[in-house]
Structure formats: structure tokens, C-alpha cells
Amino acid sequence: MTTSIKTNIRFQLGIIFSCAAFFLIASDSRAADSSAQPVDLTGKYPVPISVLTNGNWLALKTMPVGHQIFHHVPLEIGGEIHLWGEGKGTNHYSSYPEKVSDIAVNRKFEALYVYHGSYYKSPDGTPVFKVVLRYEDGSSATNTLSFGADILDWMVSPNEAPLRTPYATNSEIAWVGGQFSDTQKNRLRFCLTALNNPHPDRTVSTIDLISCKTRTIPFVLAMTTGPAGLLNDNAAKH
């Protein structure tokens, strides 16, 4: 068997295994909750969906985009919102900001579901970024997502067995699959975190995303508001 044929077979097997991994994760999710509503991030994505789907980087071409449902939560994945981290300050599209402000919401909800990934590892428990809910009455509430508890590196290490999952009870693996590049066969991993709104009776006007300026670079792909407890039916934590 020639080298080129062997290479082609290995590539096809890699795609098959990636698709299988995607199916296993996605099959855990039942129908989306009808009261959950994706947040429109269209004007906030510095990396738009066209880059994710039409670029040359295999990782971006093999990750899920558009309408997706993970763990009962409907998501609209239209790009990536990166925040600054010490691992790398810029990419080849734009600078990573320390803060992304005034994401319009204008509704009441019990929980905010954040679909995210990250580059560069930090020690477990390291704060990575904050999600600030700004209410119509001028008050605010802040949640902090930390490495290990909520956030994991988006590249799955080749020797990572079993698959590492977030250890916080309000965070889950949402999707695993794809492939980092033609030469690096690492699968990709994204997490989903449920942030309970301490004041569900108040209208949330906007949301801010703020970097904690540690080594890890977080990125948010989608957010959805809805009832609390959508992740509660999933498998127990390891």
C-alpha cells in the first residue's frame, strides 16, 4: 500500500472518529427548551461565522456553527468573541480586548447559558473571565468563570484519557469533535456553563464580558437566556 493511500485512509478514519465523537455528545441533548432564547451577538463578533466556515484552518471548519442544541439549550453560534489573556495578546484578525460591553438583552430570565472555549491552560481555580449582568434599574450582578471548574483548553490532549470535564456543577462539556489541523489530530472541546440570575424578576438590559487578565484566553461563541436547571438532567460529575 502506498504512503499516499495510507495517509488518505488515516485522514478519513480521523473524520469518522470526529463525527462519532460529535454524535455521542450531541445525542445527550434532547429537544431544546421552548422558553430558552439565544442572545443576538451578531454585532459583537470580531471573528464572524464566515471566517469559521470558509477559512483554511481545519479546526474552524470542523467545529459546529449556526443553530445548535446542546443539553436542551438552543444556541446560535455566529462567531467567536475573544478576551485578552497573557498567553497571546492578538491574533491575525484583530486585537483581543479586555472587555466587551453592552451586549443587548432587554429581558427577564432565570439563567444565562454561556457556550465557550479557551486557549492556554491555567492552574485549576484560576479566574478567567467575568460575566456582568446589568439591570434596567442600574444595578448589576457578576459571575466569574474559572479554569478547570468551568473552562478547559479547547484542544484535547492526545493522552487525555478519560476526557477531562469541568468540575463545577453548573458546567458541562457541550461538544467534542473535529480536528485541530491536518498535522495535529487533537479533537476540539467546548463547554456550556449555566449562570443563575440572582434577580430573575428584574429586566437585564445588557451583558458585559470582562477578562481577568490571566494566562488563559477565553472565547465565547454563543449565549442563551432561559429557565434555570436545563443542565440538571445530565450525567453526574466525575
What are these regions (language model features)?
Residues M1-F11:
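N-terminal secretory signal peptides that target proteins for export/translocation
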Residues S4, S18, S27-S29:
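Serine residues within intrinsically disordered or low-complexity segments
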Residues Q12-I25:
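Bacterial N-terminal signal peptides
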Residues R30-H238:
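N-terminal/edge-of-domain interface segments
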